[in-house]
Amino acid sequence: MPFIPHSPEEVREMLSVIGVQSIEDLFVDIPAEMRPRSFELPLGLSEMQVLAKMEEMAARNRTDVVSFLGGGFYSHHIPAAVDALVSRGEFYTAYTPYQPEASQGTLQAIFEYQTAVCRLLDMDCANASVYDGGSAIFEAMMMAVRATKRRKLVIDEAVSPIWRTMLASYTSNLSLDLVTVPQVDGRSDMAAMKAAVDTGCAAVVVQNPNFFGVVEDFTDLFAHAKSQKAASVISVYPVMQSVLKTPGEMGADIAVAEGQSLGQPLSFGGPYLGIMTCTKDMVRQMPGRIVGRTNDTEGRTGYVLTLQAREQHIRRAKATSNICSNQALCALRTLVHLCLLGPEGLIRTAELSMERARYAMERLTAIAGVRPLNTAPFGNEFAVRLPIPAFEAVDRLTARGYVPGFPVGRYYAGMDDVLLVACTEKNSFEQVGILAEMLGGIL
């Protein structure tokens, strides 16, 4: 529908009908000193001028760099078929499937997505997703609070600081007791977390691999939490789950993930995907939409939104969350991506990423003054200490077309010299070699 402004005659007619003389009369309730005297808007531009302006702004983005950035968001290859299939109109423009008789295709796609992520994480149930990895952790924490009727939450400092900042914002007015257990050289302090998880604890929250890329086994911690009747929440990197011990094998009650690495392109601000799974015992605390499969009176398979009494369109303030829009299109991208790769393809993606990361660790730590932050096992990401501030290394190499990683000191005190380096299947061995040569040249 085109935007056609009202003519002056139409404006006068509308003002006359409502009994005012001018548009300004509509704002008389706003004190004059609070009204802007002028918006100082520039004159309008032609279509060609607007296009040129947008291209000028877009050119400020660097798209020609080789990146080793990670920290929870990774540049994996996305098959072209993902965009081709997801952009079909029946998916791209579909609305929330409240009417199952008219939405079987959308509902089945969500059901298949739920099935896929449950198999990947070895959990019982999944929802249709939430906004992103950070909101998924928050919703998991609130599930635990509702289930246990407790207010204390223990969170590992090695959980992404980006997500922990989100949690602080989400919970600022909820009267929750967030206890952060300090990490030790990028590793989880298991003993300290066990000590913090007591009979007053609602949940313990961890990440695997953690923000520093370290792979941990939380089986004992989760068993201890269960003995205290506290829930176990784990955030995972879904690509690495194809080769690591699953949340289900560790005994997690709730497993969540940032789903960006499965079919979502890197984008500042998203949209991304919050994967949420849990055990059967926790499913009624799950927020968002859940699709179930059943048979109708004629024996035909049908898909419906199930357990809807949890949702805000049924219970309003008493719902498990106020999520009203979901990331179903992003969830579909993840489903298509997983189906195109298959189990072997996903495992191969993880293996290639890990091979390159191990080669990068060998090459970088061979440089004088560079040493690993710890000796723990890692997946496709690791942290090293440099003889200069990591910010300086990032700035100098980025200017030359290589982003060497993420400066950890941005979020962790005392780690200004720590660089977080991530590799995916898109980073070649040649690129890793060039990175090592460039880094060695400035140290």
Swiss-Prot record:
Belongs to the GcvP family. N-terminal subunit subfamily. Keywords: Oxidoreductase. HAMAP family: GcvPA. This is Probable glycine dehydrogenase (decarboxylating) subunit 1. The glycine cleavage system catalyzes the degradation of glycine. The P protein binds the alpha-amino group of glycine through its pyridoxal phosphate cofactor; CO(2) is released and the remaining methylamine moiety is then transferred to the lipoamide cofactor of the H protein. GO terms for biological process: glycine decarboxylation via glycine cleavage system; nucleoside metabolic process. It comes from the Bacteria. It catalyses: N(6)-[(R)-lipoyl]-L-lysyl-[glycine-cleavage complex H protein] + glycine + H(+) = N(6)-[(R)-S(8)-aminomethyldihydrolipoyl]-L-lysyl-[glycine-cleavage complex H protein] + CO2. It is an enzyme of class 1 (oxidoreductase). NCBIfam families: PRK00451.1 (NF001696). Its EC number is 1.4.4.2. InterPro entries: GcvPA, GDC-P_N, PyrdxlP-dep_Trfase, PyrdxlP-dep_Trfase_major, PyrdxlP-dep_Trfase_small. The gene is gcvPA. The glycine cleavage system is composed of four proteins: P, T, L and H. In this organism, the P 'protein' is a heterodimer of two subunits. GO terms for molecular function: glycine dehydrogenase (decarboxylating) activity. The lineage of its organism: Bacteria, Pseudomonadati, Thermodesulfobacteriota, Desulfovibrionia, Desulfovibrionales.
